Amino acid sequence: MRIGRRTDVEQVHVSEHGCSVLENRQPVRPAEGLGFTVLPDADGWAPEVGFVQGFPVARDPGAGIAWLAHCYGMLGAGRAMAADSSVGNELYVVTGQSPRQLDRNITTVGRVVQGIEYLSVLPRGTGPLGFYEAAGQRTPIRAIRLAADVPEA
């Protein structure tokens, strides 16, 4: 599996990147200068949606902000209430219906660029929200690489 590198769309640490946090949610960044390709479709979660460098992005032109959207193939990291509290030990990949209600609520950190077909067929857990109830149900991740670290073919 290959994971796309973070782009300038996302901001992970408020103090490091100087971005703003809205209502204790995932940091957003100024939308200006992103090279945003807007989609014509209406969206119930943001005034506009589209892509920046292949990443699904939502934006609010009125507020001048943009954020990564929770779409199929996006990689997220669980966190506590503080927007910069994720340590990366709780990762997930969106493999079904896009949970857009998680936009700006749970941190997105990248996207799967190769291998999503293997992730999407893994059995779901039997616990609440599809979590695995027993450690033996979990599928180990044997390798994850940043796309930037993979030699060109």
Language model: regions and residue ranges:
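Cross-family detector of peptidyl-prolyl cis-trans isomerase
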Residues: M1-A153
